[in-house]
Amino acid sequence: MFLIVGLGNPGLKYEHTRHNMGFDAIENIAAKHNISIDKKGFKGLYGKGIIDGEKVILLKPYTYMNLSGESVVEAANYYKINKENIVVIYDDISLDVGKIRIRTKGSAGGHNGIKNIVLHLSSEEFPRVKVGVGEPTENLVNYVLGKFSQDERKKIEEVLNIVTEAVECMVVDGVQNAMNKFNGLKL
């Protein structure tokens, strides 16, 4: 079983902002695999389903970004999911819009949501999918909580489909195969 987590902030104010790439990715995965994310629990919203024969839990923590680890660890503990089967999807300002990077482990790289997950799991060793949102052109907070331009939004729609394919590959063929196939791919 896999726990697929998309990071973001709850509420209409944050919908489709750069910082909510994880939520958008989870919604895209859910739509493709007919998984309803309508259950309340684990300090978030989640849904259970199947991706290519593998059981998955899709989770959107509603703790706000900086406390995401609380939600992740609750779900992981409840379902007894190993860290290697927790996939976290989130925005990355060091990657251009339209680029993704998959990692098996690593530091938080300044991302507060990841910092909190590392803290709660007591480990940096969980796979993640970083989705490029571009370098800030203004104040960091305003930038990540801002929406994409119309041109960027077109790329993001495409990248969300690629993220879905990457997660499918991670679940079925393993993280290393997904890294080989999707890292370096740019729209």
Curated annotation (Swiss-Prot):
Active site: H19
GO cellular component terms given for this protein: cytoplasm
Protein's job: Hydrolyzes ribosome-free peptidyl-tRNAs (with 1 or more amino acids incorporated), which drop off the ribosome during protein synthesis, or as a result of ribosome stalling. Catalyzes the release of premature peptidyl moieties from peptidyl-tRNA molecules trapped in stalled 50S ribosomal subunits, and thus maintains levels of free tRNAs and 50S ribosomes.
GO biological process per UniProt: protein quality control for misfolded or incompletely synthesized proteins; rescue of stalled ribosome
InterPro entries associated with the record: Pept_tRNA_hydro (IPR001328), Pept_tRNA_hydro_CS (IPR018171), Pept_tRNA_hydro_sf (IPR036416)
Key word Glycoprotein present: no
Protein name stated in the entry: Peptidyl-tRNA hydrolase
GO molecular function: peptidyl-tRNA hydrolase activity; tRNA binding
Family affiliation: Belongs to the PTH family.
Keyword RNA-binding found: yes
Site entry (Stabilizes the basic form of H active site to accept a proton), positions: D91
EC primary class: hydrolase
Domain of life the protein comes from: Bacteria
EC number: 3.1.1.29
Location within or outside the cell: Cytoplasm
Keywords: Cytoplasm, Hydrolase, RNA-binding, tRNA-binding
Complexes and interactors: Monomer.
Binding site for tRNA: Y14, Y64, N66, N112
Originating organism: Clostridium acetobutylicum (strain ATCC 824 / DSM 792 / JCM 1419 / IAM 19013 / LMG 5710 / NBRC 13948 / NRRL B-527 / VKM B-1787 / 2291 / W)
Site residues (Discriminates between blocked and unblocked aminoacyl-tRNA), renumbered to this chain: N9
Any matching Pfam family: Pept_tRNA_hydro
Gene that encodes the chain: pth
Catalytic activity: an N-acyl-L-alpha-aminoacyl-tRNA + H2O = an N-acyl-L-amino acid + a tRNA + H(+)
